[in-house]
Amino acid sequence: MGKVYDWFEERLEIQSIADDISSKYVPPHVNIFYCIGGITFTCFLVQVATGFAMTFYYRPTVAEAFASVQYIMTEVNFGWLIRSIHRWSASMMVLMMILHVCRVYLTGGFKKPRELTWVTGVIMAVCTVSFGVTGYSLPWDQIGYWAVKIVTGVPDAIPVVGPALVELLRGGVGVGQSTLTRFYSLHTFVLPLATAVFMLMHFLMIRKQGISGPL
């Protein structure tokens, strides 16, 4: 093992990277509430893993979506556990995100020079809520269907562009297969990619600027 490590160390300088990560200064005022962001990140990783596992069995069609979810819950080995963990961690992610935003706001972590860190965090908060809205519809049961119908109908109240936005979200005049396809694409590709990009930016800025000082 020593020779393998030496081979990688010679080429990648792993030890210097590890020393840089482990030697980062942590202000003395930091407490357990500063870990909430990390918990949110952990929930996101759980979501990615369990969600990816379910894509092997889920079928994003109005005719088969509900049956495929039932199949995951009753026939797939540990499918019920994977889906349950996905649901529980989704709720936990939203809760931790709210607590993290409150902690940052109350401790002044959004002030100069960390405005952009705050902006990326707000964008990720919007993505998190969007995960919930799009994921709620995927079983395509009565609750999911009517939730989509109500949510996609909200922009209709916007003057001039409202009807066009509704049609864009639904993929047509009414809620149907095009709507489910769009929500599935948003939930499994667009939102995870956007969240990962802004999360990387968020972490890099925190790494560069450090943790904000006490009020």
UniProtKB/Swiss-Prot annotation:
Quaternary structure (record): The 4 large subunits of the cytochrome b6-f complex are cytochrome b6, subunit IV (17 kDa polypeptide, PetD), cytochrome f and the Rieske protein, while the 4 small subunits are PetG, PetL, PetM and PetN. The complex functions as a dimer.
Binding positions for heme c per the UniProt entry: 35
Main localization of the protein described in the UniProt heading: plastid
Molecular-function GO term, any one: metal ion binding
Cofactor detail note: Binds 2 heme b groups non-covalently with two histidine residues as axial ligands. Binds one heme group covalently by a single cysteine link with no axial amino acid ligand. This heme was named heme ci.
Co-factor requirement: heme b; heme c
Gene label: petB
Keyword Chloroplast carried by entry: yes
The protein, known as: Cytochrome b6
Organism whose genome encodes this protein: Chlorella vulgaris
Amino acids binding heme b 2: 86, 187
Pfam families: Cytochrome_B
